[in-house]
Amino acid sequence: MTKTKIMGILNVTPDSFSDGGKFNNVETAINRVKAMIDEGADIIDVGGVSTRPGHEMVTLEEELNRVLPVVEAIVGFDVKISVDTFRSEVAEACLKLGVDMINDQWAGLYDHRMFQIVAKYDAEIILMHNGNGNRDEPVVEEMLTSLLAQAHQAKIAGIPSNKIWLDPGIGFAKTRNEEAEVMARLDELVATEYPVLLATSRKRFTKEMMGYDTTPVERDEVTAATTAYGIMKGVRAVRVHNVELNAKLAKGIDFLKENENARHNLS
């Protein structure tokens, strides 16, 4: 049975929209990682820069100071480690310590050394769709064009296709209607040769799905609904805050999807 990967979010920042300040010292970060592993995480995604609306850009030095001590403390755990960064300097420092993948919210467009660095360490990379929100074509077409172009550049740099993940970038440079369009057409991204990661956890999109004001934590059940929907559309991994809920749900959906496929194969 194909297992959907669960990526647990570890923000080592003081200002992330959902859990800023909760895990930004090594001891609390270690405890959170251990808990997420017990809850079913396959990957831990460590981020040292907030992506919330209105966040302030931190310096390279500050990002390194936030991320490296935590990565060094957890890199030996029995789980894949990803680092959420768009800076090749941060990526290389973490890859030297033994992390497995880089989650680049700018898909290599911010730092053109990123692909070379990831290839050098034979690591995986996640390419997320982003931008300034201005586009000359419909959102899904623009997303596919942009991500496939960057994936091609990653392959030229020496990263094999099976180590390149695509993320549609829910919550980034899209209107509410554009996000709904991207979700409805996830199968078109899945139809490419690359595995797809879906990252909707606690974002504005899930708030708007509920139709009333909520705190980020109150969006976990709706996040789980997007997990189920994404798996049925063919995504291979989900990035979430509430690991336990989504891991259990994914296990059930994986079973049902496998059962459905087996029945179709018999008919």
UniProtKB/Swiss-Prot annotation:
Q: What does this protein do?
A: Catalyzes the condensation of para-aminobenzoate (pABA) with 6-hydroxymethyl-7,8-dihydropterin diphosphate (DHPt-PP) to form 7,8-dihydropteroate (H2Pte), the immediate precursor of folate derivatives.
Q: Which Gene3D superfamilies match?
A: Dihydropteroate synthase-like
The UniProt entry, under NCBIfam families, shows: DHPS
From the UniProt annotation, give the residues forming the signal peptide. Answer: none
Q: What is this protein called?
A: Dihydropteroate synthase
The enzyme class is transferase
EC number(s) given by UniProt: 2.5.1.15
Reaction(s) catalyzed by this protein?
Answer: (7,8-dihydropterin-6-yl)methyl diphosphate + 4-aminobenzoate = 7,8-dihydropteroate + diphosphate
